[in-house]
Amino acid sequence: MKHLDNLIDDLKKILGENLVTVMIFGSQAHVEPEKLKSNINLMIILEYLSSDDLKNTSKVLQKWVKAENPIPVIMSKAEWYSSFDVYALEYSDIKEKYKIVYGQDLTGDINVDKHYLRLQCESELKNLFLKYRNHYLMKINSDREMEKVANNVIKTLLVIFRGVIRLHNELVPESSEYIILQAAKFMEIDTELLIRMANVRDGKEDYKSKEIRK
């Protein structure tokens, strides 16, 4: 992908030897390079991270975001190694699905304690319920806004479900449908509803008029 190659070249020029790693994580990590177009999650790891580094890279990263990509995660090497407990869900996902596009591969050192993974699953689920209730109150009269809320809900639930599956030492399926079905072995969830929500988010189905408000 030209945009990605250009970004890496710019980061190398700006950061020099301070740039340790650039990696793709998430759903795009296993996509062939020529098919990468947008919505690419990047993690940028530096040996040391200062306010000057943020300032100096802001312009090229803003350009990257304007090309319809999420804001990259940027951190120091020390932060990377000290965050396995706080971001247990995220590191579990990264370890399973990533691609190094520049520099060192630090993922072999990822060690996620199941205690912290369980705690984050519980915390994220409770926070999701609270946020959803608030959004429901504020967006209930708009099908379009409620669909956005539902898409965000299922996106977060799938992350949590992957964590739950890993807690039980099972492999995480690729498709949203099978992730939901696998998680249902360990949780009481409405698989039919959740699969429908996932299909709508993935563009496979559409909600009927006012269905999203129920």
Where in the sequence are the language-model features?
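Residues that form or immediately flank small-molecule/cofactor binding pockets and catalytic motifs
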Residues: 27, 77-79, 199-202
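Conserved NTP/Mg2+-binding pocket subregion across the NTase superfamily
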Residues: 54, 58-148
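Metal-dependent nucleotidyltransferase catalytic core
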Residues: 1-14, 30-37, 42-87
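Active-site palm subdomain of RNA-directed nucleic acid polymerases
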Residues: 15, 19
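Short gly/ser-rich loop at a beta-strand->alpha-helix junction or flexible surface loop bordering the NTP-binding
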Residues: 20-28
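Conserved nucleotidyltransferase catalytic core and NTase-mimicking acidic/glycine-rich helix/loop elements
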Residues: 4, 111, 115-214
